[in-house]
């Protein structure tokens, strides 16, 4: 019987709704991953509601918790680390310390960094020190980097004028160290308004994918967290880059279809769980 992969997910958590680990953990478990959630912040709800309560985990607690796992002899079983929203740059450095500790215990372990920087229109902006950390430190350590368009622009200090520019920008990030760049949401002049586009760039391959863009009165939160978690999970389950890319897009689309059908603001993960595991429609990635 194949061994079940283990993944340490270090990102935010909300008590109500789905963002950060609350968006990613259950879907990753549903497709066959043992997830170890470590919450960088715990908020009552996501910040787009305009009000919330909660607290940030002190940075020193991150390696302390992981050291506890090492103490029971389980750290070498960790196959991957996923990081997302950070409450501070100090948290980010603590995560890189943990990544190094895990790679020492298991040299084959992967690290996927979702470089969450937020967006002015969505009411979630990380501190400048966090953006600097992601740009200057995290990208050099990550095996996989999963920015959205805003974050790609920040990494490259420019905005694209075409899809070709997006490819060039993602390729430039490979020089910092990652094996591949997954751009979770493309936005560039000339892009069709009725499509949602993604891009996957590695040293020897470039894949572009389109699916229908679904309309919502209020855009659901947590889609990027879901995307990064599913992509890393499929790699751990043995998919190559293209298949992980296509599966992730299809599964996320299934969640959004159910969310739209229910008129929900929060992602309908539970109702869509079977379609997360077995998407009904596959969107073919095109090699560029």
From Swiss-Prot:
**What this chain does, per the record?**
Pyridoxal kinase involved in the salvage pathway of pyridoxal 5'-phosphate (PLP). Catalyzes the phosphorylation of pyridoxal to PLP.
In terms of domain of life, where is this protein from? Bacteria
Family indicated by similarity: Belongs to the pyridoxine kinase family. PdxY subfamily.
Q: Which residues bind substrate?
A: 12, 47-48, 225
Tell me yes or no: is Magnesium among this UniProt entry's keywords: yes
Mind telling me what this protein is named? Answer: Pyridoxal kinase PdxY
> Which residues does ATP bind?
114, 151, 184, 211-214
Cellular component, GO annotation? cytosol
In its UniProt record, a GO molecular function of this protein is:
ATP binding
Q: Kindly list the cysteine pairs connected by disulfide bridges.
A: none
Which Enzyme Commission number(s) are on file for it?
Answer: 2.7.1.35
Q: How does it assemble?
A: Homodimer.
Names of required cofactors:
Mg(2+)
Any single biological process term in GO: pyridoxal 5'-phosphate salvage
Q: Does the keyword Coiled coil apply?
A: no
Name the InterPro entries for this protein.
PM/HMP-P_kinase-1, PyrdxlKinase, Pyridoxal_kinase_PdxY, Ribokinase-like
Pfam families attached here?
Phos_pyr_kin
Gene expressing this chain: pdxY
Known catalytic reactions: pyridoxal + ATP = pyridoxal 5'-phosphate + ADP + H(+)
Q: Which HAMAP family match?
A: PdxY
Where does the sequence pass through the membrane? none
Q: Which UniProt keywords apply?
A: ATP-binding, Kinase, Magnesium, Nucleotide-binding, Transferase
From the UniProt record, give the pathway where this protein acts.
Cofactor metabolism; pyridoxal 5'-phosphate salvage; pyridoxal 5'-phosphate from pyridoxal: step 1/1
């Amino acid at each position: 019987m194949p061994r079940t992969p283990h993944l340490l997910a270090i990102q935010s958590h909300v008590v109500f709704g789905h963002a950060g680990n609350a968006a990613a953990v259950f879907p990753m478990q549903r497709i066959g991953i043992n997830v170890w959630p470590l919450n960088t912040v715990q908020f009552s709800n996501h910040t787009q509601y305009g009000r919330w309560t909660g607290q940030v985990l002190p940075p020193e607690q991150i390696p302390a918790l992981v050291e506890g796992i090492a103490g029971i002899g389980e750290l070498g079983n960790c196959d991957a680390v996923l990081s997302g929203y950070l409450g501070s740059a100090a948290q980010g450095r603590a995560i890189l310390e943990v990544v190094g500790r895990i790679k020492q215990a298991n040299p084959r372990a992967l690290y996927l960094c979702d470089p969450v920087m937020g967006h002015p229109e969505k009411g979630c902006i990380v501190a400048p020190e966090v953006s600097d950390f992601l740009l200057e430190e995290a990208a050099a350590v990550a095996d996989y980097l999963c920015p959205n368009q805003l974050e790609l622009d920040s990494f490259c200090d420019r905005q694209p004028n075409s899809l070709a520019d997006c490819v060039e920008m993602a390729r430039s990030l490979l020089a910092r160290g990652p094996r591949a760049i997954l751009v979770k949401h493309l936005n560039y002049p000339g892009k069709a308004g009725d499509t949602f586009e993604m891009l996957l760039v590695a040293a020897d391959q470039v894949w572009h994918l389109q699916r229908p863009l679904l309309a919502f009165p209020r855009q659901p939160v947590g889609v990027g967290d879901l995307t990064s978690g599913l992509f890393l999970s499929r790699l751990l389950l043995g998919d190559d880059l293209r298949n992980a890319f296509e599966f992730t897009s299809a599964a996320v689309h299934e969640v959004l279809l159910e969310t739209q059908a229910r008129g929900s603001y929060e992602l309908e993960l539970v109702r869509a769980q079977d379609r997360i595991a077995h998407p009904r429609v596959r969107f073919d990635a095109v090699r560029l």
